[in-house]
């Protein structure tokens, strides 16, 4: 197997919308991203699964930084 010599890419997201009155699936997605309160910021690995979770709640989060 080939070793991954690249540095791990990260993506920083901030919660800008409230999960109140949102479907349970969207609330669970925010929890999966490590976000549960307004204006919380998390730095996550930049993987396809994380990108998909961000896309599912794009109206509730903002991408702050990509490295």
From Swiss-Prot:
GO molecular function: structural constituent of ribosome
UniProt keyword terms in alphabetical order: Ribonucleoprotein, Ribosomal protein
GO cellular component, one term: cytosolic large ribosomal subunit
Pfam families: Ribosomal_L30 (PF00327)
SUPFAM superfamilies on file: Ribosomal protein L30p/L7e (SSF55129)
GO biological process, one term: translation
Transmembrane segments: none
HAMAP family: Ribosomal_uL30_B
Protein family per UniProt: Belongs to the universal ribosomal protein uL30 family.
Summary of subunit composition and partner proteins: Part of the 50S ribosomal subunit.
Name of the protein: Large ribosomal subunit protein uL30
